[in-house]
């Protein structure tokens, strides 16, 4: 029998979130009552904290907030539900249900996230349970899509190595399943499972314990030469090592993470550091033991310092390696060589193994809906009706129609043509390499616009791009509405992080291959200043770049910023 987990003594008073988790009866709280309370479209904050473990955030429409306050109404509460899709894989049947959920219960759109998951926004409280039950019918769920647990496990999307990719994808699915919370609360609350009145004495979380992790935890697997998952931004980054076209194991990197707090230099983005190599049969055990180290030693007092990166930085990588070896009972091997070439996606039709085809669509900022002159949601619905392969959500918020048989390719190509679905070929390379988080109006943390603003800002930057002949030059550009890092803006060659309405910090100098952070270049500037700052740098780059030199490398060589390979130097 598995014994209950007892945490070692903690320093500092536990945060209020730790109290909520401890008292929650394994994530139940009072959710059953408050989600059925007809007097409010929202729920109390304690239950909102627990809803995250069930894959949902309570939000409100911030565009309406002031007017509703004036009318003495409660905020326009709504729920965002994030669906867990390991490796970004979804069947056509699952796609059709997500499409229906967006139109039936949401705001009519799907958001593809930078962690290869679906998000549906605008769900009213009374519809959340129906939503959960209907996605369950096609074997989808939102358990652990948010919260202080391991989140959606990411996996490289690489059609050029289809057989290998499938093997690696299967490992991402196994990791996701192995690290799921074991509480029955999700099934009780949303799927009408048998109720457990008080499970404190008989329910066990064999990996997490009753308090779960100090903060969220993220894992991704990359297959070189593609680093589309931004493997060094993860708590655990796994790099598939291939010899003679066969997977022999994974290099393991630990302690990455993007979030920080403006003005607090004790918080910073950080790159995961490689600690060695493991064979595939050791993967689940190694990941579990790493998570238990964070469970036991992570900061449960100050949440902004609770991520795994701070645990490692506070105690040292040598301490971590010794502790991991102690828990495993064996030492991992030396890291193996590999090379990354890019973090972006390859668009259009690509022929993979076994004669099957893959088509990658450019989805600007991951937003799928029927625009006035671009029926993207409808077009993809029609493809899902005839497609016999699968869909792959990419870490760059794009979409791959994957494993298309030669027999279906003509039909799907015709639908792509009919609805003018785009691979982005007519867009600038800058736009094709852009990412933005949702931000306003639904994100409660947003300080500035992101998804609604970045496309128009890029249009203005493209004027400079056109003038300098850089239209086909790939430059990674990302925008976050706050410093929490959902768009991984700290790993962009040009990064924007919101400071306030219409104001951003401008960061430069991350690497095109995803192994270096950027650094602040200008603080708290608006659009006019952004364009004025970028113009001379882009002109300089166009004139004096070396052959094959990426923008992020150039701005370091030219002295605009210094290189950052350790997050503790991010603010220096």
UniProtKB/Swiss-Prot annotation:
<feature type="binding site">
    <location>
        <position position="482"/>
    </location>
    <ligand>
        <name>[4Fe-4S] cluster</name>
    </ligand>
</feature>
<comment type="pathway">
    <text>Sulfur metabolism; hydrogen sulfide biosynthesis; hydrogen sulfide from sulfite (NADPH route): step 1/1.</text>
</comment>
<dbReference type="InterPro" id="IPR006067">
    <property type="entry name" value="NO2/SO3_Rdtase_4Fe4S_dom"/>
</dbReference>
<keyword id="KW-0521">NADP</keyword>
<dbReference type="Pfam" id="PF03460">
    <property type="entry name" value="NIR_SIR_ferr"/>
</dbReference>
<dbReference type="GO" id="GO:0051539">
    <property type="term" value="F:4 iron, 4 sulfur cluster binding"/>
</dbReference>
<keyword id="KW-0349">Heme</keyword>
<dbReference type="InterPro" id="IPR011786">
    <property type="entry name" value="CysI"/>
</dbReference>
<dbReference type="InterPro" id="IPR045854">
    <property type="entry name" value="NO2/SO3_Rdtase_4Fe4S_sf"/>
</dbReference>
<dbReference type="GO" id="GO:0000103">
    <property type="term" value="P:sulfate assimilation"/>
</dbReference>
<comment type="function">
    <text>Component of the sulfite reductase complex that catalyzes the 6-electron reduction of sulfite to sulfide. This is one of several activities required for the biosynthesis of L-cysteine from sulfate.</text>
</comment>
<keyword id="KW-0408">Iron</keyword>
<keyword id="KW-0028">Amino-acid biosynthesis</keyword>
<keyword id="KW-0479">Metal-binding</keyword>
<dbReference type="InterPro" id="IPR006066">
    <property type="entry name" value="NO2/SO3_Rdtase_FeS/sirohaem_BS"/>
</dbReference>
<dbReference type="GO" id="GO:0050661">
    <property type="term" value="F:NADP binding"/>
</dbReference>
<dbReference type="GO" id="GO:0070814">
    <property type="term" value="P:hydrogen sulfide biosynthetic process"/>
</dbReference>
<dbReference type="InterPro" id="IPR036136">
    <property type="entry name" value="Nit/Sulf_reduc_fer-like_dom_sf"/>
</dbReference>
<keyword id="KW-0411">Iron-sulfur</keyword>
<dbReference type="GO" id="GO:0046872">
    <property type="term" value="F:metal ion binding"/>
</dbReference>
<dbReference type="Pfam" id="PF01077">
    <property type="entry name" value="NIR_SIR"/>
</dbReference>
<dbReference type="GO" id="GO:0020037">
    <property type="term" value="F:heme binding"/>
</dbReference>
<dbReference type="GO" id="GO:0009337">
    <property type="term" value="C:sulfite reductase complex (NADPH)"/>
</dbReference>
<keyword id="KW-0004">4Fe-4S</keyword>
<feature type="binding site" description="axial binding residue">
    <location>
        <position position="486"/>
    </location>
    <ligand>
        <name>siroheme</name>
    </ligand>
</feature>
<dbReference type="InterPro" id="IPR045169">
    <property type="entry name" value="NO2/SO3_Rdtase_4Fe4S_prot"/>
</dbReference>
<feature type="binding site">
    <location>
        <position position="437"/>
    </location>
    <ligand>
        <name>[4Fe-4S] cluster</name>
    </ligand>
</feature>
<keyword id="KW-0560">Oxidoreductase</keyword>
<feature type="binding site">
    <location>
        <position position="486"/>
    </location>
    <ligand>
        <name>[4Fe-4S] cluster</name>
    </ligand>
</feature>
<keyword id="KW-0198">Cysteine biosynthesis</keyword>
<comment type="similarity">
    <text>Belongs to the nitrite and sulfite reductase 4Fe-4S domain family.</text>
</comment>
<dbReference type="GO" id="GO:0004783">
    <property type="term" value="F:sulfite reductase (NADPH) activity"/>
</dbReference>
<comment type="subunit">
    <text>Alpha(8)-beta(8). The alpha component is a flavoprotein, the beta component is a hemoprotein.</text>
</comment>
<dbReference type="GO" id="GO:0019344">
    <property type="term" value="P:cysteine biosynthetic process"/>
</dbReference>
<dbReference type="InterPro" id="IPR005117">
    <property type="entry name" value="NiRdtase/SiRdtase_haem-b_fer"/>
</dbReference>
<dbReference type="GO" id="GO:0050311">
    <property type="term" value="F:sulfite reductase (ferredoxin) activity"/>
</dbReference>
<protein>
    <recommendedName>
        <fullName>Sulfite reductase [NADPH] hemoprotein beta-component</fullName>
        <ecNumber>1.8.1.2</ecNumber>
    </recommendedName>
</protein>
<feature type="binding site">
    <location>
        <position position="443"/>
    </location>
    <ligand>
        <name>[4Fe-4S] cluster</name>
    </ligand>
</feature>
């Amino acid at each position: 029998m598995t014994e209950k987990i007892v945490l070692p003594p903690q320093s500092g008073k536990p945060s209020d979130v730790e109290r909520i988790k401890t008292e929650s009866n394994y994530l139940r709280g009072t959710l059953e009552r408050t989600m059925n309370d007809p007097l409010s479209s929202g729920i109390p904050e304690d239950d909102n904290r627990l809803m995250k473990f069930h894959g949902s955030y309570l939000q409100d429409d911030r565009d309406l907030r002031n007017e509703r306050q004036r009318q003495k109404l409660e905020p326009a509460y709504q729920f965002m539900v994030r669906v867990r899709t390991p490796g970004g894989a979804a069947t056509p049947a699952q796609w059709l249900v997500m499409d229906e959920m967006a139109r039936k219960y949401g705001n009519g759109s799907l958001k593809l996230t930078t962690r290869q998951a679906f998000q549906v926004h605008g769900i009213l409280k009374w519809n959340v349970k129906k939503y959960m039950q209907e996605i369950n019918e096609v074997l989808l769920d939102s358990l652990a899509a948010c919260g202080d647990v391991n989140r959606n496990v990411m996996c490289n999307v690489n059609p050029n190595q289809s057989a290998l990719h499938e093997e690696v994808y299967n490992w991402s699915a196994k990791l996701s399943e192995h690290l799921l919370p074991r509480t029955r609360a999700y099934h009780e609350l949303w799927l009408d499972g048998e109720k457990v009145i008080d499970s404190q004495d008989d329910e066990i979380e064999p990996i997490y314990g009753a308090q779960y992790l100090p903060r969220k935890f993220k894992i991704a697997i990359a297959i070189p030469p593609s680093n589309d998952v931004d493997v060094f931004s993860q708590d655990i980054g796994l790099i598939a090592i291939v010899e003679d076209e066969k997977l022999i194991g994974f290099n393991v990197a630990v302690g990455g993470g993007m979030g920080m707090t403006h003005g607090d230099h004790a918080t910073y983005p950080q790159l995961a550091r490689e600690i060695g190599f493991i064979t595939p049969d050791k993967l689940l055990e190694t990941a579990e033991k790493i998570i238990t180290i964070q469970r036991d030693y992570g900061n449960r007092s100050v949440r902004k310092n609770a991520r795994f990166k701070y645990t490692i930085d506070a105690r040292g990588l040598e301490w971590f390696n010794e502790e991991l070896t102690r828990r495993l009972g064996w030492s991992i091997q030396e890291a193996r060589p590999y090379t990354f070439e890019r973090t972006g996606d390859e668009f259009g039709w690509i022929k993979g193994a076994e004669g099957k085809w893959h088509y990658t669509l450019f989805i600007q900022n991951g937003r799928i809906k029927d625009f006035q002159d671009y029926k993207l949601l409808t077009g993809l619905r029609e493809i899902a009706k005839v497609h016999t392969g699968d869909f792959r959500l990419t870490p760059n918020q794009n979409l791959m129609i994957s494993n298309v048989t030669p027999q279906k390719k003509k039909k799907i190509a015709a639908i792509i043509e009919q609805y003018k679905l785009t691979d982005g070929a007519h867009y600038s390379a800058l736009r094709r390499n852009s990412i933005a988080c949702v931000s306003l109006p639904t994100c409660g943390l947003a300080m500035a616009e992101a998804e609604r603003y970045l496309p128009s800002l890029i249009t203005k930057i493209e004027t400079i791009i056109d003038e300098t002949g850089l239209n086909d030059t790939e430059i990674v550009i990302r925008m976050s509405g706050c410093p929490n890092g959902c768009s991984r803006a700290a790993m962009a060659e040009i990064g924007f992080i919101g400071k306030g309405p219409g104001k951003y910090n401008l960061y430069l100098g991350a690497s095109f291959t995803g192994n270096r952070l950027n650094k602040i270049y200008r603080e708290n500037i608006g659009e006019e200043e952004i364009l004025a700052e970028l113009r001379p740098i882009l002109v300089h780059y166009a004139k004096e770049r070396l052959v094959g030199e990426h923008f992020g490398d150039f701005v370091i060589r030219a002295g605009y910023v210094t290189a950052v390979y350790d997050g503790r130097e991010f603010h220096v």
